[in-house]
Amino acid sequence: MFGLGAPELILILILALIIFGPGKLPEVGRALGKGIREFKNATNSVTEEIKEAAKIDDGNNNSDKEKATRQAS
């Protein structure tokens, strides 16, 4: 996971606890989780759009090739 071991993760958690405090830490964790989830959804959406565009392009290229083959015959 990003080359982070247990000692690094513990250090990050301790720093977060010092910076945000124990009362605010769950709220920060929820917000961070929500942000990561939204980012993943957005990247998945873009990936799917690119795949769909590639499929459409492949379909158009194949039909153009077929037309060229028919015209050459």
From Swiss-Prot:
GO-annotated biological processes: protein transport by the Tat complex
Cellular component annotations (GO), alphabetically ordered: TAT protein transport complex
Membrane association type: Single-pass membrane protein
GO molecular function, one term: protein transmembrane transporter activity
Disordered, as annotated region: 52-73
InterPro entries: TatA/B/E, TatA/E
Compartments (UniProt record): Cell membrane
UniProtKB keywords: Cell membrane, Membrane, Protein transport, Translocation, Transmembrane, Transmembrane helix, Transport
Keyword Manganese among record annotations: no
Membrane spanning stretches: 1-21
Its biological purpose: Part of the twin-arginine translocation (Tat) system that transports large folded proteins containing a characteristic twin-arginine motif in their signal peptide across membranes. TatA could form the protein-conducting channel of the Tat system.
Family statement drawn from the similarity comment of this UniProt entry: Belongs to the TatA/E family.
Quaternary structure and partners: Forms a complex with TatC.
PANTHER family, per the entry: SEC-INDEPENDENT PROTEIN TRANSLOCASE PROTEIN TATA
Record-given protein name: Sec-independent protein translocase protein TatA
Gene: tatA
